[in-house]
Amino acid sequence: MAQVKRIRRNISGIILLDKPLGFTSNAALQKVRWLLNAEKAGHTGSLDPLATGVLPLCFGEATKFSQYLLDSDKGYETVMQMGQTTNTGDAEGEVLQTRDVTVGRADIEALLPRFRGPISQIPPMYSALKRDGQPLYKLARAGEVVEREARSVTINRLELLECEGTRARLSVGCSKGTYIRTLVEDIGEALGCGAYVAELRRTQAGPFALAQTVTLEELEQAHAEGGNEALDRFLMPSDSGLQDWPLVSLSEHSAFYWLHGQAVRAPDAPQFGMVRVQDHNARFIGIGEVSEDGRIAPRRLIRSE
């Protein structure tokens, strides 16, 4: 008997998942997509299986704006294990070196200012960056080490929360592209004892905070009680990740032309930059960019939700 193809739902919005330990970001996405029975889905930047915390999952029209969440600042809490280094920079790797830990809280506090602000990082071999089409982590697993260019990132916040024995808990606020494993390794080297990431939890992604997240267990429970549609209450609007952007309202006439690809003027538009756009019914219809002549050019449009 032929298997009946599952008809997926055309739904749009964002679910803020507290990614569980041990899941890849894609595995978590596909699990939630299955629970929702959503037609289209995407996430906004990978979290390592070791990491937990804020993972915005985009569905339907919201996937058009996932890049802007990917580009946003992030926040983390991490536990730094001092005295050892591993080949992956975290607790899942093989120990490469063990050293005595002769530093304490005061030493760490004195060192942290060196790592605040703009810094340079060399991406780790165990990362998803590609060389000639191959992810670096695959090369690393094959025993290869290739040269990586340093990249500039910004550490907006770096605070020591706790220090006990050979472990220290740090709070980090950073720009996109920052590798917390590399940051911890570099701090460990500067302390003279080496270090790796023992725990990692993302506390913020753009405007989204940990307190807004839902767990996989909560989603599974809702699905068990009410099916796919029971999860719809967890969906946030597609423009939730853009709330810090200026909002521009268009008249019915202007919205018609804007939705057909034409730049239009709006009385409440800023002088420059990206904006959220809504129609005369206060319905989000896409994002635009204010051009030099003051008109708003459409950049990403959404279908009626």
Curated annotation (Swiss-Prot):
Regions crossing the membrane: none
GO biological process, one term: tRNA pseudouridine synthesis
Free-text function comment from the UniProt entry: Responsible for synthesis of pseudouridine from uracil-55 in the psi GC loop of transfer RNAs.
Keywords, sorted A to Z: Isomerase, tRNA processing
A GO MF label: RNA binding
Catalytic-site annotation from UniProt: 48 (nucleophile)
Protein's name according to its UniProt entry: tRNA pseudouridine synthase B
InterPro entries on file: PsdUridine_synth_cat_dom_sf, PsdUridine_synth_N, PUA-like_sf, PUA_sf, tRNA_psdUridine_synth_TruB, tRNA_sdUridine_synth_fam1_C, TruB_C
Stretch forming the signal peptide: none
Enzyme Commission designation: 5.4.99.25
PANTHER family: PSEUDOURIDYLATE SYNTHASE TRUB1, TRNA-PSEUDOURIDINE SYNTHASE
Annotated HAMAP family: TruB_bact
Catalytic activity line of the entry: uridine(55) in tRNA = pseudouridine(55) in tRNA
Similarity remark: Belongs to the pseudouridine synthase TruB family. Type 1 subfamily.
Enzyme class: isomerase
